[in-house]
UniProtKB/Swiss-Prot annotation:
Principal subcellular localisation of the protein: membrane
UniProt KW Lyase keyword: no
The name this protein goes by in its record: Zinc transporter ZupT
Species of origin: Xanthomonas campestris pv. campestris (strain ATCC 33913 / DSM 3586 / NCPPB 528 / LMG 568 / P 25)
Tree of life domain: Bacteria
Catalysed conversion reaction: Zn(2+)(in) = Zn(2+)(out)
Amino acid sequence: MLEVSSHNVWTALAVTLAAGLATGLGSLMVVFAKKPNPRLLAFGLAFAGGAMVFVSLSEILNKSIASFSNAYNDKLGFTYGTLTFLGGMLLIMVIDRLVPNPHQSLSTDDPQFRDDNRAYIRRVGLLTAVAITAHNFPEGLATFFATLESPAVGMPLAFAIAIHNIPEGIAIAVPVYFATRNKFYAFGASLLSGLAEPIGAGIGYLLLSSVLSEAVFGAVFGVIAGVMVFLALDELLPAAKRYAQGHETVYGLVSGMGTLAISLVLFRYAAP
């Protein structure tokens, strides 16, 4: 069994909590700020998608293969790493089918937002919060275990997930705010959904801490890589394309990949 210091655990949990709290930031944009610039939102979503795809394929999947190789051999390491990567995508596909994530964020300009239709809006807000909360559990696990093994990988991933969480906070806050006219309720609903990430991380660690090994790390990282790639391709990039009015999606995608690539190089040189 691998030994993990309590300092690393608390660091990983803090990073995961910070990423989850970004949903609250999204709700603040609804209740206090003006309507967000759709082109900037498109760029930000694509940036997060590019960052998540790059770090998943270049670092997390490689760590899965390396961990399996240390536990077995190079041939089995590559095989098991690939299989768990595909298994991660299959897992999140099943979750997505059982608890569909609302891909179309509601807008304050939507004709559904009328004073005589608050019951409908309240139901939409509840369903949106439940769906996004369910999807936040695997994201919390991804951030936690990536940071636990290597902050150089976990922190950039947490940054990408935090960007991804901002529009999720907006998606929850819009129907709640217009159903209740209460800023506190809108902020609280978004924040509680984001807290699913550190809660999911804590539950995952408690379940796996007694059996942590190279093989377990390999399986966790393989699944995480698959989940992150699926989320980027299924949620972030399509959402970015919806808001884009030009080439913001491809510019954001390339910028996200480039930024993560440079940050990982700098982390390598900064490491002792």
